[in-house]
Amino acid sequence: MERINVTPRSDYKEKIEALGFDFHGDYWREEACYRFTTAEIEQLEEATREAYRMYCEAAEYIISEKPEFMERMLQIPPEICKRIRESWDQDELSLYGRFDFLLDERGVPRILEFNADTPTSLLEASVIQWQWKEECFPECDQYNGIHEGLVQSWKDIFPAGSDIHFAGALDDHEDTGTLQYLASTAMEAGFSTRVLDMNAMNLQDGLFYDPSGERIRRCFKLYPWEWMVNESPDGCLAQVEWLEPIWKLVMSNKAILSVLYELFPDSPYVLPCYLSR
């Protein structure tokens, strides 16, 4: 990986805000970029595949063999644990997640965490970075197919023509921007979408309804399962096809890193991790 100093575009703020990235603040910087070799990219791809495989094995171990870990260490109520097991056993599909890696002194990716439930930095990585690259380095390639992958995944997860609600904390600009971008990818895939605030969802008799009275059957929520478990346990059990599925609650808790190290202590991607209680 090579850090390269570059000259920022004089009008970059106007350009990225025109693409919906109006929550960039000071963290989008164009003074430098990073160049990877093909071998480094292939190593990251392999590390990501292997990391997700290990996370799935760790989740299976916790959900199927160590359910007391969910209640005791993750502090998940028994009725929610039961729903997690059902969700996992039914292979409820996931849309996406984000691994955070560091590169050690040998250049080997090491897992810091898996943002399994409410990952952001999505619009930036898929659209904004691409526009910058095309304008500044058109001869180079971008290492990701996020946008195309999202469009295809909607088709793989939900029946054609479905209505999909997108819910989150709309008073947060980053969450709103992420939801609007995700909704646009679903629309590109041929789905009808509605974006609403989590507080606008009305729970009645185990069903959720939007402000217009329409039943919410399929919903992507950019809202942590941990919060929902605390605020609305009954809502967690409602008849909704959620993205992300509720089994992501297990993967998103950093306590799973200790299980990952227990199961895969010799993996080059896993850092030592222990629980103090």
Task: Put a short name on every predicted segment.
Residues 1-277:
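Preference for protein termini
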